[in-house]
């Protein structure tokens, strides 16, 4: 693979296409592996349980679910929504027993040779794991596929297009998280909303997210522990929403804008109101508290208890220093050696929520309030043509 830092700015789209986009064969392999595990969860896993267990749905999460998988990253997150889990506390208290049962059944299938595949179950790292991790391999798969299966409480039920959760779901989440002191612990319950947050985004924005993720992973190899990758994905969405909003844009400019946001991490206060807002008094009070926390504040658009920016000032400082160094590399230089410009980010919000409360009082760098995605402009940018379109998938396995 060509070194990203030495890739000319004008060639970043080609770099993404040549090295980061998963090819059709790779996607087919991953989907085949997912079908095997989904079938197992549906038909076999809880068939002999001592009490009824209904799997209401299995949802593909993580990068695979969002459509931002990097080439060569053979992993998949499957969130299994189970009927016995009726509260967030149930999920916390009982997920271990369901993980143990899934593991037991996988190992039984392995002994019985029920599948033409091999499961290599990973030992949990702590006593109450959030996920069962294993590797699935077969002759049909070119390489092993790493799985994380996460039991979850079905807080949302069946979703429809344009779904916005009943505020009482978030009231319940806030109250239980506060009582348990487990803020951000139940983001898996909102996997579908996290996926849908990116689902309708332009293909090229997803390519920019892939580029930022590739940069982040290079930094992580060098620096070690860093803020969560999801925070960088959200920063990329924020940069595009406030600086471009076009389906075709200059990739180097977008990339530089994201790195400048990282450099200015101590000024970041970013959140969205697509799924929750300030209209309910309990949610409003909680959001006010979240938004006055030390910067950076980057709230999960699907889960107001999840602050992706908090808890790792050292990691942000290291990442910012690395970003500053990167701005001097060829990937941010024009053909004449001048630096690529970044997007000018709009600082004002047109959110209807401003009538109820003035969230901009919390703003240092930015605020996002989105209810509906706008109609994207299809006018090509004069700066740079779009890369080859990618096939996108929306994947939910609903168990009837």
From Swiss-Prot:
Binding-site list for Mg(2+): 75, 77, 148
Gene3D superfamilies given in the database record: 2'-5'-oligoadenylate synthetase 1, domain 2, Beta Polymerase, domain 2
Residue ranges of the region described as Interaction with dsRNA: 13-60, 200-210
Alphabetically ordered keywords of this record: Antiviral defense, ATP-binding, Cytoplasm, Disease variant, Endoplasmic reticulum, Host-virus interaction, Immunity, Innate immunity, Lipoprotein, Magnesium, Metal-binding, Microsome, Mitochondrion, Nucleotide-binding, Nucleotidyltransferase, Nucleus, Prenylation, RNA-binding, Secreted, Transferase
GO biological process, one term: response to virus
Transmembrane regions: none
GO cellular component: cytoplasm; cytosol; endoplasmic reticulum; extracellular region; membrane; mitochondrion; nucleoplasm; nucleus
EC number of the protein: 2.7.7.84
Residues the record lists as binding ATP: 63, 210, 213, 229
Effect recorded for residue 77 to A: Loss of activity
GO molecular function, one term: ATP binding
Upregulation: By type I interferon (IFN) and viruses.
Outcome, altering residue 66 to A: Decreased enzyme activity
Consequence of substituting residue 198 to V: In IMD100; results in increased 2'-5'-oligoadenylate synthetase activity leading to increased RNase L-mediated cellular RNA degradation, translational arrest and apoptosis
CDD domains: NT_2-5OAS_ClassI-CCAase
Pfam families: NTP_transf_2, OAS1_C
Lipid-attached positions, S-geranylgeranyl cysteine: 397
Effect of residue 333 to A: Loss of activity
Annotated localization: Cytoplasm; Mitochondrion; Nucleus; Microsome
Record-annotated disulphide pairs: none
Regulation of its function: Produced as a latent enzyme which is activated by dsRNA generated during the course of viral infection. The dsRNA activator must be at least 15 nucleotides long, and no modification of the 2'-hydroxyl group is tolerated. ssRNA or dsDNA do not act as activators.
Disease tied to this entry: Immunodeficiency 100 with pulmonary alveolar proteinosis and hypogammaglobulinemia: An autosomal dominant disorder characterized by onset of respiratory insufficiency due to pulmonary alveolar proteinosis in the first months of life. Disease development appears to be influenced or triggered by viral infection. Patients also have hypogammaglobulinemia, leukocytosis, and splenomegaly.
Subunit structure as annotated in this protein's UniProt entry: Monomer. Homotetramer.
Record's protein name: 2'-5'-oligoadenylate synthase 1
Species assigned in the record: Homo sapiens
